[in-house]
Curated annotation (Swiss-Prot):
Region (Disordered): 1-24
Record gene name: rpmB
This protein's name: Large ribosomal subunit protein bL28
Gene Ontology biological process terms from the UniProt entry: translation
Entry-linked PANTHER family: 50S RIBOSOMAL PROTEIN L28, LARGE RIBOSOMAL SUBUNIT PROTEIN BL28A
Compositional bias annotation for Polar residues: 14-24
Length: 62
């Protein structure tokens, strides 16, 4: 199971770290994903859901 929100599609993003000298190195930002049990097609399933989707009420825990 990929680390991606099944509701909003939020996932890891890539970018650069920048030092004071403006040197760049690759880094990643992870989405705030929580593993929760929700109803998928009428059956309880454990999936990754973003904290934003949980707070906004887009998904209901089982």
């Amino acid at each position: 199971m990929a680390r991606k929100c099944v509701i909003t599609g939020r996932k890891t993003k890539a970018g650069n770290n920048r030092s004071h000298a403006m040197n760049s190195t690759k880094r990643t930002w992870g989405a705030n994903l929580q593993k929760v049990r929700i109803l998928v097609d009428g059956k309880p399933k454990r999936v990754y859901v973003s904290a934003r989707a949980l707070k906004s009420g887009k998904v209901e825990r089982v």
